[in-house]
Amino acid sequence: YVRPEQRAAGWNRDRIVAAINALGVPCYQGSCSEVYMEKAFDGTGWRPAAPLPTAHALGTTSVMFLVHPTLTQAEVDTTCTAIAQVMQQATAA
């Protein structure tokens, strides 16, 4: 998750995702943080009476990376390097 209070001026989640993608590493926004909003929960009684603020916050700050068993160590290393490089810029004071 991208913590808003730790971002440098001019950086937001979309800019972070774009910068990681520009380095050739697939990166996306989103999560299933507010899954209770899905149609499958209509009429079940399982949906909370009010939106859950932490779930909403996580949904608006999350980033996603490809994770699957066919990734090579080199691909994982490239991903980690790109994340570190971008986050160093995105959190600089």
Residue ranges and their predicted role:
Residues R15-P51, A57-V63, T91-A93:
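Conserved PLP cofactor-binding pocket of PLP-dependent enzymes
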Residues I83:
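Hydrophobic "lid"/C-terminal helical patch
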Residues Y1, S62-L66:
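Short aromatic/hydrophobic contact patches that present stacked aromatics
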Residues A57-L58, P69-V76, T91:
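Feature detects long, helix-prone N-terminal segments enriched in hydrophobes
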Residues Y1-R3, V35:
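Conserved glycine-rich beta-strand-loop-beta hairpin in the small C-terminal domain of fold type I
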Residues R7-R15, L71-D77:
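Short, conserved charged micro-motifs
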